[in-house]
A protein has these predicted regions:
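Hydrophobic, aromatic-enriched alpha-helical segments typical of multi-pass transmembrane helices
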Residues: 1-264
Length: 264
């Protein structure tokens, strides 16, 4: 092996298990955050009920936000690992794109913290104000006014604009980074066409169905530790790009094999 190729394979082997563990930990933390949040917030309707529940379970709200922040932030590890592996096998990739791969999860982690603080601040203001105290006595008659007051409390939270900035920037960076890494990993043969295409699709829809991307990350973690049937694609062991044959190339290869068998 060339020194650069040997170094690449050594780095990938050394970090495969730690990155896989970080990936699994990320998924568990995000799921735990969802569970904690669902237990803390009741099934009441409207933003007024939401803020009352949050104020009554402030510790759970803060815990959920921190769990989500750590979980989302850890997704930078598998994305960076995949990006670096593909970059080592392709001269077409732009190294500067690694910034989006790292910034996306980290900005979304900051968003989780800021959103949690924003909601806690709004809940405190809402519950301590005169309007919700009046509407709470006649909730059937004043629920609309209570929800309006709760909406105002959320929109007037001082950290809300900053959270929006990190949210938009993080979602765009995560979307582009996951698409870019999955695309080139598929082109270099590190991911099968199915999982590469799925990574691209889930990356494109991550701002709507973020939780579904966790299924793809679980697969990638299992791939890194070799717990999948068939093992890793050949490109992982060779250190070189081994693109998957197109349907036309595959059909041509099958025809050639058939002709050779007939001649024999």
């Amino acid at each position: 092996l060339r020194p650069d190729k040997a170094a690449t394979l050594a780095w990938e082997e050394r970090w495969a298990r730690p990155v896989a563990l970080a990936t699994f930990a990320s998924v568990l933390l995000i799921v735990a955050a969802i569970v904690v949040a669902s237990q803390a917030v009741g099934g009441g309707n409207g933003e007024s009920e939401l803020l009352r529940d949050v104020d009554a379970h402030r510790g759970a709200q803060l815990t959920s936000s921190l769990l989500q922040a750590f979980g989302v932030g850890l997704l930078a590890a598998p994305l960076y690992y995949l990006f670096r592996a593909a970059k080592a096998r392709s001269e077409r990739m732009r190294g500067a794109m690694v910034g989006l791969v790292l910034v996306g999860p980290l900005f979304l982690a900051v968003l989780a913290v800021l959103s949690g603080i924003t909601t806690l601040h709004a809940a405190s203001d809402f519950v301590s104000s005169e309007m919700p105290r009046l509407t709470a006595k006649g909730i059937a008659l004043g629920s609309d006014r209570a929800d309006e007051a709760a909406s105002d409390a959320l929109s007037e939270s001082p950290l809300r604009p900053l959270a929006a900035i990190f949210g938009i920037a993080g979602q765009i960076a995560f979307l582009v980074g996951m698409i870019y890494a999955s695309l080139h990993a598929m082109r270099t043969g590190l991911l099968t066409r199915f999982w590469g295409s799925l990574g691209i699709a889930l990356g494109a829809l991550s701002f709507i169905f973020f939780q579904f991307t966790l299924l793809w990350f679980i697969y990638f973690g299992l791939l890194l530790v070799g717990w999948l049937p068939g093992g890793k694609p050949p490109a992982w062991a060779s250190g070189e790009a081994e693109p998957w044959p197109t349907p036309g190339e595959k059909a041509a290869g099958e025809l050639e094999s058939g002709d050779s068998a007939d001649q024999d």
